[in-house]
Curated annotation (Swiss-Prot):
Native organism: Haemophilus influenzae (strain PittGG)
Family named by the database record: Belongs to the CcmE/CycJ family.
Protein name: Cytochrome c-type biogenesis protein CcmE
Alphabetized SUPFAM superfamilies for the sequence: Heme chaperone CcmE (SSF82093)
Periplasmic membrane side: 30-173
Biased composition (Basic and acidic residues): 156-173
Record's keyword terms, sorted: Cell inner membrane, Cell membrane, Cytochrome c-type biogenesis, Heme, Iron, Membrane, Metal-binding, Signal-anchor, Transmembrane, Transmembrane helix
One GO term (biological process): cytochrome complex assembly
Protein function: Heme chaperone required for the biogenesis of c-type cytochromes. Transiently binds heme delivered by CcmC and transfers the heme to apo-cytochromes in a process facilitated by CcmF and CcmH.
Record-linked Pfam families: CcmE
One cellular component term from this protein's GO annotations in UniProt: plasma membrane
Amino acid sequence: MNPRRKSRFKLVIFVVLGIAIASGLMLYALRQNIDLFYTPSEVIQGKDNNPNQKPEVGQRIRVGGMVVEGTVVRDPKSLKVRFDLNDIGPAITVEYEGILPDLFREGQGIVAQGVLTQSAVLSATEVLAKHDENYVPPELGEKMQKVHKPMGIKAADLKGESERDRQEKEGAK
């Protein structure tokens, strides 16, 4: 190898190594900001019912589901709130300290973002409530469609009000 070719080769190697190191450091720094989306069933059973695809304790995740009625427990001396969240399967417990959104209530859909402290307990840093009665986060909507199709539930049945809502409205009149 002549000296000129050798110096070019060294330059190319250094540039490639520099890009690889910079990319690795950038991915390492952004790793903590990557939040994977799960449903409560996937937190307990794993994605596609594969236990190897369950989130690990200590991992930052986002969980979307419905607040289970009768499970909201507020600490009278602080802003701590504890409630259960489920989809159509098992529920997980969410612990949150802070002011909840105005639209937060039992039986409504939310997305909680935080760290999994136990296999079925999420310590939330943020709780997002849905915008209106028809809003479903895109990730949750896709997951619910996959689950409901095999059960024979049509997409039209998932939108709007339920039979129970209609009965309550008629009873109030």
